[in-house]
């Protein structure tokens, strides 16, 4: 208020309010109850930014981009008809159990014959569909990417727009959950997954890279 007065702002101070006062809270609560009565309020399963150390949601404004060492891993998905493999490059092999689809650009002739078909994930033998989407980058890696729930914002967009399955494998503490994701029924795949349970994402990344190398 002092700053506003010194700046000479024309303000009706009788209308002053704060966002945490009783009047503001009542107005907010009434507004929500009105939306609920109209059927405009709903619950929905959706991803969020999460801090695994403090166990709390994180605002976009709190994020910082940092460079760190990484590596591309080339992973072979097996065509369901047995006609060969589809290679993808990823820096996040630990998300392989959370893979729900492969995505390529609709104009990429290399993968157009695959659209609408399925492939199987290595190690876990889960069948996933192959889709076309304009956000896929033809000139990045092999030009086809795995969509996992969730590695980045692009995964979220693909998951929503293509109405993909949810296979969340990382718990609130940042470790691999004990319950195998949906679709994983292969005995060998279940054994591979069991070896990851309780590991951090970084530990799981190393383990899956080693398993892929040995397979």
Which positions does each model-derived feature cover?
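Short, charged, amphipathic alpha-helices and their helix-cap/turn boundaries
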Residues: 1-3
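Phosphate/diphosphate-binding loops
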Residues: 199-215
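NTP-handling and nucleic-acid-processing catalytic cores
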Residues: 6, 10-11, 15-17, 21-179, ...
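Acidic, Ser/Thr-rich peripheral helices and adjacent loops at domain boundaries
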Residues: 182-202
């Amino acid at each position: 208020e002092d700053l506003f007065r010194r700046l000479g702002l024309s303000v009706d101070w009788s209308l002053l309010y704060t966002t945490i006062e009783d009047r503001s809270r009542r107005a907010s609560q009434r507004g929500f109850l009105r939306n609920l009565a109209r059927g405009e309020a709903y619950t929905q399963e959706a991803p969020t930014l999460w801090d695994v150390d403090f166990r709390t949601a994180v605002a976009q404004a709190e994020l910082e981009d940092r460079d760190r060492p990484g590596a591309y891993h080339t992973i072979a998905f097996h065509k369901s008809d047995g006609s060969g493999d589809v290679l993808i490059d990823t820096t996040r092999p630990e998300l392989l159990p959370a893979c729900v689809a492969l995505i390529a650009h609709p104009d990429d002739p290399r993968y157009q014959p695959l659209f609408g078909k399925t492939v199987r994930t290595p190690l876990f033998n889960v069948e996933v569909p192959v889709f076309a989407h304009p956000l896929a980058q033809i000139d990045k890696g092999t030009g086809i990417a795995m969509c996992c729930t969730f590695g980045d914002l692009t995964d979220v967009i693909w998951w929503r727009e293509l109405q993909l399955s949810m296979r969340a494998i990382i718990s609130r503490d940042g470790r691999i959950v004990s319950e195998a994701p949906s679709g994983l029924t292969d005995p060998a795949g279940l054994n591979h997954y069991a070896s990851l349970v309780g590991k951090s994402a970084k530990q799981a990344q190393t383990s899956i890279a080693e398993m892929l190398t040995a397979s």
